[in-house]
């Protein structure tokens, strides 16, 4: 079905010790969207990108290498609900830095 596509929130595969890039391998051009967030020590707690230990920079590099050109969003969750502007700015700044390090911008 052309209307059914894949999406990956990168924390659950990380927590389950699965390869995030395996989603791209399995879904190919049906992999349509990513929720980019960080995590730490196998916990499903969502952290601002760059503030945990998920290898986001390496993932971004691989996404660039395979030609991923679809959508991605930064996910802010309840830990950051009281001051979303502050945390959104920090998340965007961190992502810009990670993207630059991965050679995307």
Q: Predicted segments — roles?
A:
Residues 1-105:
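Histidine-acidic metal/acid-base catalytic patches
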């Amino acid at each position: 079905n052309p209307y059914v596509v894949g999406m990956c929130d990168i924390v659950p595969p990380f927590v389950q010790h699965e390869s995030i890039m395996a989603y791209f391998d399995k879904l190919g051009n049906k992999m349509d969207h990513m929720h980019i967030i960080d995590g730490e020590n196998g916990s499903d707690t969502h952290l601002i990108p760059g503030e945990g230990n998920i290898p986001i920079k390496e993932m971004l590099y691989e996404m660039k290498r395979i030609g991923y050109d679809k959508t991605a969003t930064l996910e802010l969750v309840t830990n950051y609900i009281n001051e979303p502007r502050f945390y959104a700015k920090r998340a965007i700044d961190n992502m810009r830095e990670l993207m630059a390090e991965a050679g995307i911008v």
